[in-house]
């Protein structure tokens, strides 16, 4: 059993679309970044990569690589899942929190979780998404940025098979 954590923060800017957990949200600003800047998916990728001892998102999908310009972060998550599977790991569960002053995200959390579960090929019940504000404090609270945190639990495939545990 291995546990990893992930964190990401991106600046909010006009002229970009807002994507969280692969869901395009109506909002006057979007997250600035090389890919679609989906902070939620980026935090989840980092948690999974860290749990597997595979470095971080920047090691595998650098913002200096033109192949990742504007790419959907769900594709990065799918590739992260493939890397874990190749190393013999299985995702047991993911718990993630988005920090955003606005917009309200409650109605979109299930879709975000479902998108990430689909990208990883696991049951949606194994992915939990929460949302909170920072009560007007810091860059997130001032509406200048959004952030996300994630924790992931993975096991080796042999452990899953022998104990009958795991998602899916």
UniProtKB/Swiss-Prot annotation:
Q: Which positions are annotated as binding a divalent metal cation? A: 8, 10, 42
Q: Per UniProt, where does 4-CDP-2-C-methyl-D-erythritol 2-phosphate bind?
A: 8-10, 34-35, 56-58, 61-65, 132-135, 142
Q: Which InterPro entries match?
A: MECDP_synthase (IPR003526), MECDP_synthase_CS (IPR020555), MECDP_synthase_sf (IPR036571)
GO BP annotations, alphabetical order: isopentenyl diphosphate biosynthetic process, methylerythritol 4-phosphate pathway; terpenoid biosynthetic process
Gene3D superfamilies referenced in this protein's UniProt entry, alphabetically: 2-C-methyl-D-erythritol 2,4-cyclodiphosphate synthase (3.30.1330.50)
Q: Which UniProt keywords apply?
A: Isoprene biosynthesis, Lyase, Metal-binding
Uppermost EC category: lyase
Keyword Lyase on entry: yes
Give the note describing cofactor binding and stoichiometry.
Binds 1 divalent metal cation per subunit.
Q: What reaction gets catalysed by this protein?
A: 4-CDP-2-C-methyl-D-erythritol 2-phosphate = 2-C-methyl-D-erythritol 2,4-cyclic diphosphate + CMP
What domain of life? Answer: Bacteria
What are the required cofactors? a divalent metal cation
List residue numbers at the site (Transition state stabilizer).
34, 133
Please provide an example of a Pfam family that matches this protein in its UniProt record. Answer: YgbB
Q: Which PROSITE patterns match?
A: ISPF
Named in its record, the pathway it takes part in is: Isoprenoid biosynthesis; isopentenyl diphosphate biosynthesis via DXP pathway; isopentenyl diphosphate from 1-deoxy-D-xylulose 5-phosphate: step 4/6
Molecular functions (GO terms): 2-C-methyl-D-erythritol 2,4-cyclodiphosphate synthase activity; metal ion binding
In short, the EC number is: 4.6.1.12
- UniProt keyword Metal-binding, yes or no: yes
Protein purpose: Involved in the biosynthesis of isopentenyl diphosphate (IPP) and dimethylallyl diphosphate (DMAPP), two major building blocks of isoprenoid compounds. Catalyzes the conversion of 4-diphosphocytidyl-2-C-methyl-D-erythritol 2-phosphate (CDP-ME2P) to 2-C-methyl-D-erythritol 2,4-cyclodiphosphate (ME-CPP) with a corresponding release of cytidine 5-monophosphate (CMP).
The entry assigns this protein to a family as follows: Belongs to the IspF family.
Subunit and partners? Homotrimer.
Protein's recorded name:
2-C-methyl-D-erythritol 2,4-cyclodiphosphate synthase
Q: Which organism is it from?
A: Desulfosudis oleivorans (strain DSM 6200 / JCM 39069 / Hxd3)
